[in-house]
Amino acid sequence: MSSNNVPAPRRKCVGVKVGSVMIGGGAPIVVQSMTNTDTADELATVQQVEQLARAGSELVRITVNSMEAARTVPAIRARLDDMDCHVPLVGDFHFNGHKLLTAYPECAKALAKYRINPGNVGHGKKRDEQFSILIEMACKYDKPVRIGVNWGSLDPEMLARIMDENARSPDPLGASQVMHKALITSALESAARAEELGLGRDHIVLSCKVSGVQDLIAVYGELAAQCDYALHLGLTEAGMGSKGIVASTAALAVLLFKGIGDTIRISLTPEPGGDRAREVIVAQEILQTMGLRAFVPLVASCPGCGRTTSTYFQELAESIQIYVREQMIIWREQYEGVENMSLAVMGCVVNGPGESKHANIGISLPGSGETPVAPVFVDGQKTVTLKGDNIAGEFRVIVDEYVRTKYRKKVANA
């Protein structure tokens, strides 16, 4: 039993190898994302996959919905490998996946995992046949499968069966509970059928996606208690901007705190012209804020108030945040553990010095109306006071020096 302020131990589950990435089995929680390009557009898809991988996505899902898309997948994989981008690709199949995987074996081989929605692989006998073909292809090419159930596309026959059973029950469930049961039943029955067809438990990941925060928490709590498959977490559509971030964080934080979840995806609606990689950064920040993984040094900064020199303080905090994320591309390759470094950029003398001492490196500005004079604290000790017009640049030099001297340099592979 965990204490009230410590996350529960991770739920034990069967590990699933996806290319070079392990999901579940005690492995770190995996961050993944999905492209929104037409997969038949090779160049656009390669560029976006590379962008997402560079941002930190450890798996990238691509839509495979047409003959043109299926034909293009091997070329996408080859071009990414030529760019030294080896992120595993997951094929997202709906309606016609059985045909595409059968007709294009090179596509089947190039993908590291298949995503199947049991609610849209046909109905009745066709559903059984088409689902069987998908699983047989996964077995043939030794590929893991995510059986991804979605409340917007539940198998109508299965849903009708559960509703009929509920209607005959002396203690019937409410509508939302029936939906939860249907999602879980679809996932578990599909997984059991996949095993009957020869797919190992170590090749199966499950997800039951909904849009409501409370629904997601309830469904995954029940699903986690009923199986030991690896679980993929995420709202099916979180929304745009702050709403999407808040909804995803509210749902996933509760489940992750309970030890539930082996891979996550934040399904944000991009703003027009927005950066697709934002969903990757949000996923990383959720995990890092909860102490479950570390990706980049955390920069703590106060919100500002009437005591802060707002513009200068905000510009300094932003510049350090951007600098650290950009430098991590280099630091990650050169220094062990640098992602655990903590920084603080504080705006005034009320809490600034104290907060700065809690970080590995902290800087505290004096406050509103005063000439910028900023003491810097390194591992709790005041080391220097920065003045003048280049405080940000001098602080970056201090951060660089700290990284070089405090973190062990990685040994290059022989």
From Swiss-Prot:
Pfam short name (any one): GcpE
Superkingdom in the source lineage: Bacteria
Binding site residues for [4Fe-4S] cluster: C302, C305, C348, E355
Enzyme Commission designation: 1.17.7.3
GO biological process, one term: terpenoid biosynthetic process
Disulfide bond annotation, renumbered to this chain: none
Reactions catalysed according to its record: (2E)-4-hydroxy-3-methylbut-2-enyl diphosphate + oxidized [flavodoxin] + H2O + 2 H(+) = 2-C-methyl-D-erythritol 2,4-cyclic diphosphate + reduced [flavodoxin]
InterPro entries listed in its UniProt record: Dihydropteroate_synth-like_sf, IspG_bac, IspG_bac-typ, NO2/SO3_Rdtase_4Fe4S_sf
Protein keywords: 4Fe-4S, Iron, Iron-sulfur, Isoprene biosynthesis, Metal-binding, Oxidoreductase
Entry cofactors: [4Fe-4S] cluster
Molecular function GO labels: 4 iron, 4 sulfur cluster binding; 4-hydroxy-3-methylbut-2-en-1-yl diphosphate synthase activity (ferredoxin); 4-hydroxy-3-methylbut-2-enyl-diphosphate synthase activity (flavodoxin); iron ion binding
Cofactor note: Binds 1 [4Fe-4S] cluster.
Pathway note: Isoprenoid biosynthesis; isopentenyl diphosphate biosynthesis via DXP pathway; isopentenyl diphosphate from 1-deoxy-D-xylulose 5-phosphate: step 5/6
Sequence similarity: Belongs to the IspG family.
Function: Converts 2C-methyl-D-erythritol 2,4-cyclodiphosphate (ME-2,4cPP) into 1-hydroxy-2-methyl-2-(E)-butenyl 4-diphosphate.
Protein name per UniProt: 4-hydroxy-3-methylbut-2-en-1-yl diphosphate synthase (flavodoxin)
Organism from which the protein derives: Nitrosomonas eutropha (strain DSM 101675 / C91 / Nm57)
